[in-house]
Amino acid sequence: MSSSSNSDPSSSPDNTDFIPLKDNPKDTSSYINKKNPFVNDSFDSHDDSYLDNVNPFEYNVADDEDTISMTSDGVEFHNLGITETVDEQDKILSELQLAYPTVSRYSETLDKGLLNGDKTTKGDYTSLRRFRKPFLFDKLSPYFTHFFSEIYAAVLRVVGPPRANETPGRNLPFSPILRQIYNHPLYNIFIFVVIVLHAVLLMIRSDDPHDKSQTIDYLIIVIGILYTLEMLLKIYLFGFLYDGSSSFYDFINSYTKKTPRTMSYLRHSWNRVDFVAIVALWISVIGKKQQGIFRLFSMIACLRLTRLLNITRKTETILKSLKESSTPLVQVVSFNAFFGVMIAILGVQFFKASLNRQCVWLGDYGDQYLPTGQFCGGHWENGIKRAYLDKNGFPSNVNPRGFICAEKSVCRVVENPYSNTVSFDNFFNSLELIFVIMSSNGFTDIMYDIMDAEYFVSCLLFIISAYFLTLWLMSLVIAVVTSSFIDLQHSGKNQKEQKSVDKHLIRNKLCEKYLFYSNFIWISFIVAQFVTLCTQTYDQTSSTANRYLIFYACVDFLLAAEVILRFFAYLPDYRLFFRRYTNLVDIVLAVLNLVTLLPSIRKNPVAFGWLSIFAIARIYRCILLIPYTRKIAKLLFSNFKQLLNLMLFLVIVLFIASLCAVRLFQDLPNDGDSDDDAISFATTYESFLYMYQILTSENWTDVMFAIQARLAHLHLSWIPGAFFTLWFLFSNNVVLSMFIAVIQVNFAPSESDLKMEQLKMYLARLLRNYNPFQASLTLNALIKRNGSRKGKTVDESHYEWLYEDNIIKGFLRVTNIPPKEPLKPSLDTSPELSKYSLAKLSNNFKRFVMRDDPFSQAYFKRVIGIRWEKDMNLKTAAKDMQAAKAFVRIKQTEFLKNHPKYNDVFWVIKPSNRIRRFCQRLVMPGVNERYGGVEPYQWVYRVIQVFIYACILTAVIIECIATPIYERDHLLNDKQHAWFVWTEVAFATIFTIEAAIKIIADGFCITPNAYLRSTWNCIDFFVLVTLWINLYAVLTSHALLSRAFRAFKALRVLRLINLTQTSQRMFHDALISGFFKIFSAAVVSATLLIPFALWAKNVFGGLLYSCNDDNVLSASQCVLEYASTPNNWEVWAPRVWSNPPDYDFDRFPHALLALFEIASIEGWVDIMRSVMDITGFNNQPQTNASSGNAMFFVLFNLVSMIYILTLFIAIIISNYAERTGSAFFTAEQRAWLELRRKIKSMRPSKRPAIRPLGLRGLCYDFAVQKHGIWRRTFTGLYIVHLLFLLTIFYPCPIAYTYVRNSIFLILSICYTINICVKVYGLSFYYFFHSFWNMFDVVVTLGSLTCNIAILAKFENRSLTLLQTTLLVLVTVHLIPKFDNFDQLSKTVVASLPSIFSLIATWIVLYITFAIAFNQIFGLTKLGLNGGPNKNFRSIRNALVLLFTMTFGEGWNDVMHDYTISYPNCVNGDDFYNSDCGNKPWAYGLFIAWNIISMYIFVNMFITVVFDNFSYIHTKSSSFTNLQRNDFRQFKDSWAPFDPMVTGYIPKRNAVKFVLSLRGVYDFRIYRDEHTLRSIISKVQSKTGQQSVPMLENPLMGSEINLEALDQIIDTIDVNVVKERRNVLNSLCTEIMTLPGNVISFSNILMLVVLHKIVDHREAFPISDYIRRAYVLSELEKSIRMEKLLGLVETSIIRKTFLQHMEEKKKALENPFILLSEVSEILPETPIQEVLRQHNADPEQLLMSTRTPSVSDRSFSIVESTVPTIASGEGDDNHSVEDHLKVPTDNEPRRSPSLKEVLLRGSHSLHSNNDRTSFDIEAGFGTAESDFQFGGATEDINRIADRIDDYLDRDSFKG
């Protein structure tokens, strides 16, 4: 060992691998070769695997000999005296294998792992060892070691998260000593304690800011000093920005290159956070205390506490997932912000000065000035509408609009709301309100205020912004976080070891039976106790309460005894009893329920109510008893630990955010508004509640606006706006999205089963196509019914391909398939049930009551389902489905023979009846194929269908016009001639005739094609009945009957869904296919709601009563009258002791309704504030008297968000993904679908193929260069343009407005010059081929015209709005300038078809519910939450109000307004004379709309966006490295072959085009160095070089170096060349088999990608894979056939040539023929003919290539219009039906025999026009032919293989 080894390690310049224990203590990942999957190689990557097993205890020399274990790489490890064979069930023992390199206590052998880091001395080695074997705790129990090791691991995670590839720091004086202090465990623990103490002190100071503030401030200063010393220590040891371990040049390059990072202080992300916090702390201490801007620095100082988020491994993992998703998250947020900025600019121009106008009450004599808060646009003055008054009291010069103030009041300009902080007067205020819209909570009040101040149409900006920004773009944020977290979950899930499931079997069968059957008895006791608790009320008598108590005690003792009996049933294996979690839970519940029976608790209503949760919790046994709820519940709780960790992460984040909010907003001055004064951040607890309220988004704008108003006088209102906005964005959109990801993972199949699930789903779709009971109901499908039925013929060859072993094995990538592989997918993850199960009993009951009806769809499903469950496998599926179909037909025939009247309508009208046959000629059967009837006349049927749909549409329009108010006004004037009544009679008659025709044609309910067998017919029939009932009620003036049935007429609108197939499919996916799953989720949600509702009733029942006079203290004082002052007007009113009007917990139904409203994240804040004021029974509430009660609603709200809202979202996402098939796609398949989408959307570049010359060439360069100076200049101009748009504000000086418009005019001229340059460079033809160019022309010329007109004093409001709109549209040009924006925009556009179909379906439901609400509540009195536009009195108002309720905006308050009843309303005898509400209809309609729209369709919107974004987000693919430059290179290669940019090139040029491709698309057989020209240039002999063998070539005129030629040929890889040649042959063959004589751009790009880049075995879904496999197989056969024909042609030519030579020889030997006459006599040889053609016209040879005509049958992947058997519902988005197909022939054909092929081979050189159909079929005919590939094809393949071998051998001979 060298002498230098004894020196200090810090002095060695090569000690770059030393990792100090502070920031990376003993990182052993490099020794054991375990790479952390979460490590990111980016700037701040970490590796914290060592933290899983940390032992901070010192080694005791007096300890006994320890055991040494060796790893695979020879590193020694202590195992702490624990044996290596650990029980799999004991996780703690397995985690105690602490992996830290040490040496044996008696061994002098050094650790090789540390020696690799140049630690060459024993002293250096031992000085670095800090983690050694404990002595005392390990002797007591290994659990102590694990416990304290976990604590220290948490300390290290908080204090100093490790970093990878760090250097040891700088070598300065005292560095070794300071480094030892820095690395000592006590130092880490001390810093951890300081951080925790800092948090505690901040919390204490917040709770009591006045008494203890000075002392705590001093302690915080001390903590700041400690933080500073820690920071200085790190800077001294490792440097601030640069540690000196490398050159400064390397340091600079480390920011841009992948080089090992230094350990300098600011190179670590957490250190940067610490640095900012410490600097802010000292600024806040030095600055003026808690005043002004220094509040912000006090808040920033709290960021040091964010290190507590690393306290557990899981929370640290959550942080890492956020860090991994930070880049796409920033991109998505920036993309959303861009559109938010655009709409904010429009908001400024549209609505500036709109919120500063209010109605001001002047009084009877005009001597008062009282702003009413009602926004307005004018006022009434002597019966005339007047415009509003400005701030000086002068009339404005605009027309009155919006809400018109009543007489004795004026509409006048006042201050904007919330101290002038809420408005659209400038960009920043407008942007804040736009973000409020994006938050989907709190924006509807602003929308209605704007509608009152402006026009009704103003709501369109809010509606469009809400759908586009909130549902569309903000869903991308959810998709980013969810996708990243799901990827992390899957990676962690793959690392987990599979646990063996222990089946806890009871040996005694008698005991097993006892446990099963007695379980129903005990559960009946639980249900009885639960129902009894529901019926108990707070105001019961003492005797009743005693009876209840006796019953509870009996049940509690019985259930406690049941637990004991259950324990004895497990004997003698009593350990099995404790292994079941349910037994442990029942023990705890039994003990706690017995404790609640103690007298001290029983006599305390509050304690008894809170502890009743333990009796309620027993209901979980009922949930687990029901199979469906048990499945969902187990799926939900299967990842329960991850949910708990997320909750812990959320609580820590909430705590830190609460402390930050207190530092910012504590003790703010009041602005005099009493409502704002109620919002206070005085304590940490209150701050916690408000921050949690913002997290849930419930009225979060009230908090933000109130705090902004208090800081307005300091001009710091931007601080709460930014703080609360960022907190909302992070907590609501990011953190809550993680819960969606956790739950969604539980519903996702495992990675290993994805392809098998695809195969099962594919076969299920085949089954649906075989189903004879499938019927299409869309108008489009009905009109084309005849043609579509012909297309349903199933191609048997399709099934042959599907069920061949090699195809299935190739897709599944397996070598063996189980012969009985079950096909039906199952979501049941629960263990197998015993034979004594409730499911078995229910199945027996179903079989007993079920009747067989072979004409029902359920019967077919049941028949095939029996085969599906038992016998069907991958190889016999097609035959089984055919057998099932035939079996059903046989059963139908037998059934009709046994029941001859079954097909008779009403048992009278037989199928042969003329009237019935006439009706059958008019309509199609609703379901099934018509049995024993006739088909309708197509043209008659089409006319009738169009007429019926026209009647439906007309009826809907009339319903929208004839509202109840319109009917009432019309009937008052002319009751006898109510046109809407008679039109309703006419439509009812038409629909009745339609129903009668359908019933006569196919029967009513029990015939094979009965009318009521169709779901839509059932709806129509129900609507028809209710329509006649309503007409009867109207004509007979029966008010109650009319109101009860008026709403049902709206159901007729649902028929409009059938206008398009996409909307019908979307309706089916949203409401029908997923109904059962959604219903199951609703049931599971109810199991959460019901226990919490019962608990809330027990706790808060009877405690919410209050007196309307705040001055009384109890119910006894709430009598007589008092002086009430509503709106500062004194009125005498009686005192009333009552509950809040909209909620209470006195009865169980009331509590259930209140919690259901809370579960929708609406109204829970008001309820929480009410229970916080409880003072006791019959006592007046006081503010925050029982503030702890708020935690009940915080807990329920959090649980409901996680287990109700996120459960619905996860289930809807899962159901939609399963319906479309995307749930089973692998990463490669998702990447392929995204690539396919890109290819389909690509078009050739719109530019000339040849660059022009001169000035036009320069303009051409400006137009086409993507990164040139011209493009960058205009990108800068667009940015400047956007910045000037941000400067629009109110009030704006006229001079600045003129300057700004002048600048916009100059910019518009620049844009016009840009257009002229592009037009001149590209020409008009190419310029106007681009959409962006046409858009540019329209927007630029429009903005130029508007700017000129405005500067020319032609200004008016409409022109200004148009100008602003066009100027905003100009900024859209920035999207294609940035790659991230361009990619995200394409993602948004990709989801357009699904979004439009969803919106179309949604609009139909909007109209349906709008008509229903209008018909029921069109005359109802307005409540407190109503307004001039916020009501159901017209359809347009109803639609807008339904829109607000879709986002949950106060839907529950509006619902309670419409439950108003007498005596608070007029309840007249006639419907038109009553303004009361209707409770049943209100609860039914509002809750139905809430579930359908807010829960289902909103989440469907998110699901569609998420489904499209998941393709973009996929990164794990072998071909995702295709960049935009690769596609641009392809376009550049295409341009010379398509100079007119038609998108097509002739097939004769296709091969030349393919060979011209370079880069990733290179198809050349030989590379550049192996081309003929390159080889010739290398082997040509130079003058004078004759030392090697030469060969003189007379054609080339030079000599060839044979040795050099041999060396070059030896470098050619024969296998690679052969593979390239095969790929090229396959591509060219497939191109030539396409129909037509041209090929499109997208088609050839698709073929190039498929042959060159994509591996279809990995990337294709099942339907695409099968088609592609078929195509490749046929291509291979075609190529082999060509080779065989070529061999035959060669033989024929050779034979002809020999005959020619023989004749020539004979002619030469003939003495009578001269030699010069031989060539004239003999005919031209075939070889000479080919050579002559080649020499005369080189292109002729390419043109003579066989190109099938348009009529030829193609099997290629492109331009397919033939419907495939796999096409079905949900398959349009995720299969390549339009790109891949299997041949399907309408009529059978016979393929030629091998003999015929060989005989016709001699004529293959003839022109393509001479080819017959047999020629084409020789290569491609397969369907229903006599040509069996099993025999003849083997001969062909054998011959072709021999030709292949011959050619390969001869090609490289010599």
From Swiss-Prot:
Localisation per UniProt entry: Cell membrane
One GO MF term attached to the UniProt entry: stretch-activated, monoatomic cation-selective, calcium channel activity
InterPro entries (alphabetical): Ion_trans_dom (IPR005821), VDCC_alpha-1_subunit (IPR050599), VDCCAlpha1 (IPR002077), Volt_channel_dom_sf (IPR027359)
Location of region: Disordered: 1-33, 1764-1792
Gene Ontology cellular component annotations, sorted alphabetically: voltage-gated calcium channel complex
TM helices/strands, residue ranges: 184-204, 220-240, 274-294, 328-348, 427-447, 461-481, 514-534, 549-569, 581-601, 606-626, 642-662, 723-743, 946-966, 980-1000, 1021-1041, 1075-1095, 1148-1168, 1193-1213, 1274-1294, 1302-1322, 1331-1351, 1358-1378, 1393-1413, 1486-1506
Compositionally biased residues, Basic and acidic residues: 1771-1790
Bias (Low complexity): 1-15
Glycosylation site positions: 40, 310, 699, 786, 1058, 1184, 1356, 1508, 1773
GO BP terms, alphabetized: calcium ion import across plasma membrane
Pfam name, any one: Ion_trans
Keywords from the UniProt entry: Calcium, Calcium channel, Calcium transport, Cell membrane, Glycoprotein, Ion channel, Ion transport, Membrane, Transmembrane, Transmembrane helix, Transport, Voltage-gated channel
Record's function text: Voltage-gated, high-affinity calcium channel that functions together with yam8 to mediate calcium entry into cells. Required during conditions of environmental stress.
PANTHER family referenced in this protein's UniProt entry, alphabetically: VOLTAGE-DEPENDENT CALCIUM CHANNEL TYPE A SUBUNIT ALPHA-1 (PTHR45628:SF7)
Record note on quaternary structure: Interacts with yam8 to form a Ca(2+) influx channel.
Similarity remark: Belongs to the calcium channel alpha-1 subunit (TC 1.A.1.11) family.
The name this protein goes by in its record: Calcium-channel protein cch1
Highest classification ranks of the organism: Eukaryota, Fungi, Dikarya, Ascomycota, Taphrinomycotina
